[in-house]
Amino acid sequence: MKRFLASGFGVGLVWQNIFGNKKGGGTLAPLIFTVLVYFLNLNVLVLSILFVSLLLIYFYSVEDHYADEDPSWITLDEIVGMSLVSLASPSEMLPLIAGFLVFRASDILKQPKFVSQLEDYPGKLGVLNDDLGAGLLGLLSATIVHQVSLLTL
């Protein structure tokens, strides 16, 4: 059960088993989450509760011995990071897309530098921290896009 949860509710495991590729699950899992958030039209309160719940599930499900190596099938950390982004404007497509792109670029490239420095914490906290940092950048980007879109109405 813990492995299923840590894999982003199976997404990381399915991706790896079907495609035989260890790369890509970290993008697919938050993308699925983003599409669900948009189509379920969840409000910010529900998303805030979901964010905290996902954090708790992460700390429950990711074993410290997995976190030391950060296996690619663990994708719940990316979902947690993207859940931060979704708080900006969950029912608007453009802010979600902008936030997703900034989140993934920051997470993959480990830029700006503070995102990579957040990984220096030991164990599962280090694995999660870079996604939270990238999520904050995505949240900022999504918020800016949302605010600019309000000005153009």
Question: What do these predicted regions represent?
Answer:
Residues M1-D68, I79-L153:
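Hydrophobic alpha-helical transmembrane segments
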